[in-house]
Swiss-Prot record:
Known partners and oligomeric status: Component of the ribosomal small subunit (SSU) processome.
Protein name stated in the entry: U3 small nucleolar RNA-associated protein 10
SMART domains on file: BP28CT
GO molecular function: snoRNA binding
GO biological process, one term: maturation of SSU-rRNA from tricistronic rRNA transcript (SSU-rRNA, 5.8S rRNA, LSU-rRNA)
Residue stretches of biased makeup (Acidic residues): 1215-1226
PROSITE patterns (alphabetical): HEAT_REPEAT
Family the entry assigns: Belongs to the HEATR1/UTP10 family.
């Protein structure tokens, strides 16, 4: 029975739509899918019904199944149906109808009629409440649509749909993660499973719904992939759902199940029983073709997940039958062909094993499956083992041959291992299958006797069973008995194969071989030839071949001595190539047996052995005996090549003819193959012997099919056979029939034959004569065009060693234009004619032209690939072909572009070959205008590029040929080619330049070469912006290099600078940078002399831009200035010059990019040249000379700047305008000067330091412009910064000049300042390595400048003096009076002044004193106080710098002087400054000094330190800082004092401590009379407490000095003479710590205890609440300290009780109770005896009027007392 809660829930659900009030009814009625609530509330049922009915009729028209609801849900009576008054049965029927409708409407929610029809059910029957689950389930797959969002807004969510709660009345649709959470609930999955069952049963599933279901289940599986327990719970549910889906007839349902099963098995491997059951379910209802493929994929995936033992066992018979019925064999093959991406080896292994077990009819077909699938090794082993077992019981064992041959072909060793595991050998198994199988034998091969023995054992075991009598066997196969004296070599292959199988069967059944042979072959001839054929048959087992050899030996013994058996030798010789050593060995024995017989002219079966009445030429008995004897004596069984033995050198012609005839007439394919291989392998084989095979070659191609059939039936490798046949064509072949045979084989339709002969040609071709070579080449070309070949004709052609003469002949035979292109009288090219055009339009001629183009393409591709050694005839032929291709292009409109490009490559290769062979030559027959015209007419950039390369290559071989076409070529390149952004175009331009330009320069026809060069430069530089950025350097460097760098760099630089100027004027800054980057990289391609010379020449060109230059008359006549410069105005020329100089400056100067690219760094290039010992001195001098010229030109440009003038405006105008113009001129000239000074700096920076100094000294010493000297001096300073110490001699030179400059009174402040800074920099760098005389002189001059009253010079002088003191040390002592007082005076002068240079000045002074402290500390003591003051008050100097100086002071100055000076500085300066930074630095120095001082010195300096300490204690009374700052200062002072105290002994510290006590209590030694006693006491007690914490019990006895004063002070607190809470707290803390750290019973002294205890405990009378806890601690500590003295305990108890009486004040009692509680908690056992006196007091306090006191006693003191006594306190109260 359901619980009460369930019953109530059911009642609530039933009454969910019962509305007793109007608002509730309105709310229920307004729930709508279509309308908003306000609109819905106004609608009546009739209106809703009418709208819904119309939509319902639309649904019926779409799907007739909706018609069933016409008389129920959508009947006219439904308007009046009220669900709330229906019976249970009626409600049940209504719910069923609604559910059926929702299942049917599910795929149609996207239709408007569906919404309006369902609207009726929601409004009338409230299905969103009563059928909410079905409504949600049927629309769940629509969760991303607006419909589902509307449903969520009105539906009452069932509990299982809680994940949708956040999306109710929300603008967002549920997410994919929400669906995963929903489906991850097992209860919901069960609900959804039931829903699926219903829709499957009702057959209302549809694709989108199934797809949604599948995806959801897959997501759930993926979501729980790492949760194996959850997956195990999902397995039964998913299997159940899959089973229901598979039971459906819908292919979509089945495919959904397939997908779910595959994913589930992948995530959680299922056991085999489940997979077998799933497979059975999948196959049980498989009808549709669409589902069949998916079913097979799924089954394969399921089986692929199996692991462990038995995973590839054969299928149960029932499952196999289902698989066989569902998937026919051909279907499985097709599946494997198309679906290789699936791994399905386990399923197909099980399937194959099932075929082996149940379905033997398919055994012969399983090879097809095996060929299409890759199996694991263990799977192959299982299959092989099953097949071996099957071979024991299978009647028709021939079905197994194909499959075993396949396994042996892929892994013969594995098959043999499987046989060995079953105690079988390969030979026995071959007999069992009646065929030859194994080809690869192990080194430990069994001998013939062993094989026969094993075979006999197998026979014996077979004979033990029920064997058929031989007579019955013979009767059964009597039709195959041979009674004629015939050669069995000639019988048909079918009959022989059958006889062979009978022989194998007879042997395997245990019949004697001789019995079989004598019974089935009644004549000796047929028996011998039969065993002979078996011996050389690849299809016969090895064991059978051995038996046949044994029988042959027996048969030979039965032949009369007069019969010569040499006729059998050729076949036996081929048996010597058998893979089995045993066969070869036994064959040799048979040959030895024949050799022992007499050699007569009566040959055995001489005319019938190879054919009826076929007489084969034989050797004479003498020759045959000689041959056989020598052969056997030389033959070794292990030999693999016996060709040299077959054809001995003696009488080789006789033997060659004999063996050639034998090879020709041998009817057996295997023997013929062996024989041909032996013959064609010997060197004697030549075209004379190939004549023997003329008829064979003539008929071979027509008879090829029959030979192929023979090879297949006899298991002979047909490819080996055909290779041997193709080898008949001999090296140096002259026979035309043989060449025809070769060509026919190539052109045959048989791919194998064509490819074999194509390979054969490669070795034959070099040995043939020219006509035959030409014939073969021409036939390959013709056949490649005329028909589709079975081999790659082009590849074969390109593999042949063709010569230039072959190509010339082929090209001549395939030409179109019959005109003689080499006729020199024809100076113009042949033009396209109308006749040619009209002719080529005809179809037949057009086809011929296309074929001709194909031939030409093949020829050209071959020529391009081979790169033959060329001659002039070939070049002429190629030019003729170029004309032909133009004809085909222009007249015929054929696609000749590829052929033209290939021809261009061939022309390049040909010219290159001619050049390497003959060098320069004259080619009068070559027409360059053909090339130029082809270049112009071609529309392909690649074609144009290649033809340009041809022009260039031709120029290098025959310059005269192309010189008259130079300008058109370069014009074309500038306009088109260099704009192509590809490697090939760039290579083309570079190569063309490098070939044509030298020819141009060498030509005698060019008179004014400079004009030509400048024209070329302008042509190429104009196209600069169009050249791809990354191609520019390579292209232009090639051009300049070929034109001559020394003459061309400057004009080219001028042209580029002009474009740079244009960019600047147009504000294209980024583009202008590209020019600088380019030219830096460009210059790196040339040596340094060429670069410097180029810059110098550029200056000459820039000078031509000056209006007043003497050279400017030359400018208009130069080609270089023809591009607009001549027409420029003066102002434009000035701008151009300025920008040109700016360009030079940026090219010479270093940039960030030069750091990563050293090749473009001009400075580094110069340095490497000057410092390289391998470079000649002459070259270095040339570099220096070029640099001096560059420097002089730079300085000259600077000097000339002032004389430049120009007029930007018209001369007419007002004075104001003229003034404005002059102002602009000044600005421009200033800009030009700045550029030149920057250029000068960069130029000077190029040289090494020695050369640099030599260059600038004359400038610094002379009457050079001040700004020039200023820049030079700055550059000098920077130059020396990174120079090595070895450059000090050079530094002396420059220093001498700089010192002289500082002595000149006429020098400006700017020059003096930069000079002093440079001196400082040089001295810092080289120090004492410099000349001491110069250093002293520098010091004198700096001291003079120190008094100049100019702050700039004072700073620079101080800097120089600092570096000099650092360098010279004590040697500077004589200048002390001139430095220190002056520096102090300067500091004081500017201390309170406002100046921008104040920071630098203070820093310079601080650093000056720092250097003195470091180098001459003892001499600075007289001014140490001033140094400290300056240090503390240099506010503009960084604190880190001043702290570093403090460290130097402590390190170098004697500490006694430091302490004394600190005491003075504090008293006289710092204490009165109110400078917090100064105080902080003072304390830092004091702390550093205290930490650094040793104990001995500390003892000596202790009076000084403690005087300073007392001064620091007094600081709080005079400073203006806030309380927190004062406390931090005092904390630092206490910490420093404690560190100092730790370095003193007791003897020293006691009097000092007494001194401090007297200072605090008596005011002795107080320097500040304004400081009150309370302030002193607070400072003292803080110090004492800090010291007590550090020294603990060591200074407990020191309390004697302050015992009485402290007692008095406590009494003053009681009497309120002194009221200071902070002081009282400090006193209590000091007492507490003293009691706490007492280890010497100091406070157990009665006198001290009595003195202090009363005063301390009496503090309870008026202690402030904020410090009450400190008093409690002090009393508790005193009690703890005296706990062992009963008398003292009694005294304390009495004193405490006196403050706990009822008459006492409330707070007094409260703190007394607290104190007593602490005492008992710490020393309760010692005070138990005193408890009786306390009990009445406690009893009174428990009834105290003050609740806080009463509560403290009850909850505090009583509890503590009880814990001490161990019993309740109530007993004492009663």
């Amino acid at each position: 029975m359901s619980s009460l809660r369930d019953q109530l829930a059911q009642v609530a659900q039933n009454n969910a739509t019962v509305a007793l009030d109007r608002k509730r009814r309105q709310k229920l009625h307004s729930a709508s899918l279509v309308y908003n609530p306000k609109t819905a509330a106004t609608q009546d049922y009739e209106y809703i019904y009418d709208t819904a009915l119309e939509s319902f009729h639309t649904l019926v028209s779409l799907d007739l199944r909706f018609k069933v609801f016409t008389n129920s849900l959508f009947s006219a009576s439904s308007v009046t149906i009220d669900r709330n008054v229906q019976t249970k049965d009626q409600i049940r029927d209504l719910d069923n109808a609604v559910n059926a409708y929702l299942m049917l409407i599910s795929p149609k929610w996207h239709l408007t009629p569906a919404l309006h029809a369902t609207e009726w059910l929601i409004r009338r029957f409230q299905i969103h409440i009563h059928n909410a689950e079905m409504l949600l389930l049927s629309t769940l797959n629509q969760y991303q649509t607006p419909v589902f969002k509307r449903i969520l807004n009105i539906v009452k969510l069932p509990p299982l749909f809680n994940p949708f709660t956040n999306f109710v009345r929300n603008d967002k649709n549920p997410t994919d993660l929400t669906l995963i959470k929903l489906f991850n609930d097992m209860d919901f999955l069960k609900l959804y499973s039931n829903y699926l069952s219903k829709i499957i049963k009702q057959k209302v599933t549809y694709t989108n719904q199934l797809l949604f279901t599948t995806c959801c289940f897959i997501n759930v599986i993926a979501f729980n992939a790492n949760d194996e327990d959850k997956l195990n719970k999902l397995v039964p549910l998913i299997l159940e759902i899959s089973a229901k889906l598979l039971a459906s007839d819908s292919s979509d349902c089945q495919m959904a199940a397939h997908t779910m099963l595959a994913v589930l098995a992948t995530a959680l491997p299922l056991n085999k029983s489940i997979i077998i059951a799933a497979t059975e379910t999948i196959l049980a209802n498989l009808k549709e073709d669409d589902a069949r493929k998916k079913a097979l994929v799924t089954i394969s995936k399921l089986f692929q997940t199996l692991k462990g033992v038995g995973n590839v066992d054969q299928l149960p018979v029932k499952i196999y039958k289902l698989v066989d019925n569902s998937f026919p064999f051909e279907y499985l093959l097709q599946f494997l062909s198309n679906e290789n991406k699936y791994s399905s080896d386990k399923f197909f292994t099980a399937y194959i094993r099932s075929v082996i077990r149940y379905d033997h009819d398919k055994l012969s077909q399983i090879v097809k499956i095996l060929r299409k699938i890759k199996l694991e090794k263990y799977e192959v082993r299982f299959i092989i083992t099953d097949l071996i077992h099957l071979s024991e019981v299978l009647e028709d064992k021939s079905q197994l041959i194909d499959v075993f041959e396949y396994f042996i072909s892929i892994n013969e060793g594995l098959v043999l291992k499987c046989l060995q595991a079953l105690n079988l050998t390969g030979e026995v198994f071959e007999i069992r299958l009646t065929t030859s199988l194994f080809s690869v034998k192990n080194s430990a091969e069994q001998s013939g006797e062993d094989i026969i023995k094993v075979l006999d054992d197998a026979k014996a075991s077979t004979a033990n069973g029920s064997a058929v009598p031989f007579k019955d066997f013979m009767t059964k196969n009597s039709e195959f008995i041979s009674t004629k004296a015939e050669s069995m070599l000639l019988v048909k292959d079918e009959k022989f194969v059958k006889l062979l199988s009978l022989f194998v069967e007879a042997v395997s059944k245990g019949y004697q071989p001789g019995l079989f042979l004598s019974s089935f072959f009644t004549t000796l001839e047929s028996r011998i030839t039969f065993v002979l054929r078996i011996i050389v048959s690849p299809g016969s087992p090895v064991a059978l071949r051995l038996i046949s050899l044994t029988q042959l030996s027996k048969f030979i013994n039965g032949i009369d001595e007069q019969t010569d058996l040499f006729s059998l030798v050729p076949i036996l010789v081929t048996a010597l190539m058998d893979i089995s050593r045993s066969v070869r060995s036994n064959t040799k024995k048979v040959l030895q047996q024949i050799a022992k017989r007499p050699f007569t002219a009566k040959y055995f079966l001489s005319n019938v052995l190879y054919g009826e009445n076929l007489k084969v030429p034989m050797l004479s008995p003498k020759d045959s005996k000689f041959w056989l004897t020598n052969f056997l004596s030389d033959y070794i069984v292990e030999s693999t090549d016996i060709s040299s033995l077959v054809i001995p050198s003696k009488n080789d012609m006789v033997y060659m003819l004999f063996w050639c005839n034998q090879a020709l007439h041998l009817p057996l394919a295997y023997s013929k193959t062996i024989m041909l291989k032996l013959l064609t392998a010997v060197p004697q084989y030549a075209f004379t012997y190939s004549k023997v095979f003329e008829q064979f070659m003539a008929t071979y191609i027509t008879e090829r099919s029959s030979w192929e059939t023979k090879c297949i039936k006899n298991k002979t490798n047909f490819k080996d056979f055909e290779t041997a046949v193709c080898a008949i064509v001999a090296p140096k072949e002259k026979n035309s029939f043989a060449i025809d045979f070769l060509i026919n084989c190539l052109e045959s339709e048989y791919e194998q034959l064509s490819n074999i002969m194509a390979d054969r040609i490669l070795s034959l071709y070099p040995t043939l004569k020219f006509p035959n070579q030409l014939k073969i080449v021409q036939s390959i070309i013709d056949s490649s065009v005329d028909k589709e070949l079975s081999y790659d004709g082009l590849e074969t052609l390109q593999s042949l060693p063709l010569t230039a003469d072959i190509f010339v002949s082929v090209l001549k035979s395939n030409t179109i234009n019959s005109e003689d292109q080499t006729d020199l009288t024809k100076r113009r090219r042949r033009r396209s004619s109308t006749v040619n055009k009209s002719a080529l339009q005809k179809q037949d001629i057009s086809q011929i032209a296309e074929a001709h183009l194909k031939k030409m393409t093949i020829i050209l591709e071959t020529l391009d690939k081979l790169k033959v050694k060329s001659n002039e005839n070939l070049l002429n032929a190629l030019f003729n072909l170029l004309s032909d291709l133009e004809t085909l292009d222009h007249d015929g409109g054929l696609p000749v572009l590829y052929a033209q490009e290939t021809l261009s490559s061939c022309l390049l290769n040909t010219i290159s070959s001619l050049k390497s062979n003959n060098g320069s030559m004259k080619l009068p027959s070559i027409r360059a205008d053909i090339l130029v015209a082809a270049i112009r007419s071609s529309t392909s950039p690649q074609m144009q590029n290649k033809l340009l390369l041809v022009v260039g290559a031709l120029a290098s071989v025959s310059p005269e040929t192309i010189l008259h076409s130079v300008m058109p070529i370069f014009t074309f390149m500038g306009a088109h080619t260099i704009r192509q952004d590809d490697e090939f175009s760039t290579l083309v331009v570079e190569r063309t330049i490098s070939t044509i330009v030298p020819a141009l320069l060498k030509s005698t026809e060019v008179t004014n070469k400079s004009d030509e060069i400048e024209f070329l430069l302008m042509s190429f530089s104009t196209a600069f912006s169009h050249v791809p950025k990354h191609r520019r350097v390579s292209l232009y460097s090639t051009l300049v290099r070929e034109l001559g760098p020394s003459d061309v760099i400057a004009p080219f630089l001028f042209l580029i600078a002009q474009q740079y100027s244009n960019c600047l004027e147009k504000f294209k800054i980024a583009e202008s940078k590209n020019y600088i980057e380019f030219f830096k990289a460009f210059l790196s391609k040339f040596d340094i002399l060429e670069q410097l010379h180029g810059f110098n020449e550029l200056f000459n060109l820039v000078e031509l831009l000056d209006e007043d230059s003497s050279k400017n008359e030359v400018a208009p006549t130069r080609t270089l200035f023809s591009n607009g410069i001549v027409n420029m105005s003066k102002s434009e020329l000035f701008v151009l010059k300025k920008n040109d100089l700016d360009f030079i400056d940026k090219v010479i100067g270093e940039s960030k990019s030069d750091y990563y690219n050293t090749s473009s760094n001009l400075k580094l290039r110069i340095l490497s040249t000057l410092l390289d010992p391998n470079i000649e001195i002459e070259v270095k001098n040339q570099v220096r000379n070029e640099f001096s010229i560059l420097l002089s030109k730079t300085l000259n440009a600077i000097n000339m700047t002032d004389s430049l003038s120009y007029d930007k405006h018209s001369s007419a105008g007002s004075n104001d305008e003229e003034a404005g113009s002059e102002s602009e001129a000044e600005v421009d000239q200033k800009e030009l000067k700045d550029i030149l000074f920057g250029l000068l700096e960069h130029v000077l920076d190029l040289l090494p330091i020695q050369d640099f100094v030599a260059s600038i000294l004359p400038l610094l010493q002379g009457n050079t412009d001040e700004s020039v000297r200023h820049h030079l001096t700055v550059v000098t300073s920077n130059k020396f910064i990174e120079e090595p110490m070895e450059s000090f001699e050079t530094a002396n030179e420059i220093l001498s000049t700089l010192v002289e400059t500082t002595e000149k009174a006429s020098e400006s402040t700017q020059i003096l300042q930069v000079t002093l800074n440079t001196i400082s920099s040089i001295v810092t760098r080289f120090g004492d390595r410099l000349d001491s005389h110069l250093l002293v002189k520098s010091m004198e001059n700096s001291c003079k400048q120190l008094t100049s009253k100019k702050i700039e010079l004072e700073i620079s002088s101080l800097t120089v003096l600092t570096t000099l003191i650092q360098t010279l040390g004590v040697k500077t002592l004589a200048f002390y009076p001139k430095i220190v007082p002056v520096a102090i005076s300067i500091f004081k002068t500017y201390q309170n002044a406002k100046n921008n240079l104040k920071e630098q000045l203070q820093l310079a002074i601080v650093l000056l004193f720092a250097s003195m402290i470091k180098k001459i500390p003892s001499f600075l003591l007289s001014n140490l106080q001033d140094v400290f003051v300056i240090l503390f008050h240099s506010d503009e100097v960084a604190d880190s710098v001043r702290l570093s100086v403090i460290s130097l002071i402590v390190e170098h100055i004697p500490l006694k002087d430091v302490f004394k000076t600190l005491q003075k500085v504090w008293t006289n300066d710092v204490s009165s400054s109110n400078n917090s930074v100064a105080v902080s630095l003072f304390l830092s120095m004091l702390e550093s000094a205290v930490e650094a001082i040793d104990k001995k010195s500390a003892t000596q300096q202790s009076p000084v330190f403690f005087r300073l300490l007392l001064n620091l204690f007094e600081y709080r009374s005079i400073c203006t800082f806030d309380e927190n700052s004062i406390n931090r200062i005092e904390a630092s002072v206490h910490q420093i004092a404690n560190v100092y105290v730790l370095k003193l002994n007791d003897k020293v510290f006691r009097p000092l401590f007494a001194l401090v006590v007297n200072w605090a209590f008596n005011g002795e030694g107080v320097t500040n009379t304004n400081m009150s006693k309370e302030e002193r006491l607070m400072a003292f007690y803080k110090f004492y407490n800090k010291t007590q914490e550090n020294l603990k019990s060591i200074i407990t006895s020191y309390f004697t000095y302050l015992l009485e004063p402290t007692n008095n002070l406590l009494k003053q607190f009681i009497s309120k003479e002194t009221v200071n809470v902070s002081l009282r707290r400090l006193v209590l803390i000091s007492l507490t710590s003293s009691f706490k750290y007492d280890r010497d019973e100091y406070w157990k002294s009665t006198s001290r205890f009595e003195l202090i205890s009363e005063s301390l405990i009496n503090q309870l009378t008026n202690v402030e609440d904020v410090i009450g806890k400190y008093l409690v601690k002090a009393i508790g500590s005193l009690a703890t300290n005296n706990s062992g003295v009963d008398e003292h305990n009694k005294i304390m108890s009495d004193l405490m009780i006196s403050h706990m009486k009822t008459s006492c004040k409330t707070r007094e009692k409260f703190w007394a109770v607290r104190s007593m509680k602490l005492i008992y908690s710490k020393v309760g056992d010692g005070w138990l005896v005193l408890l009786p006196r306390l009990v009445p007091i406690i009893a009174e306090l428990l009834e105290d009027e003050d609740e806080e006191v009463e509560y403290e006693v009850r909850s505090g003191l009583v509890k503590v007392v009880e814990s001490v006594m161990g019993e309740p306190f109530d007993r004492y109260l009663s």
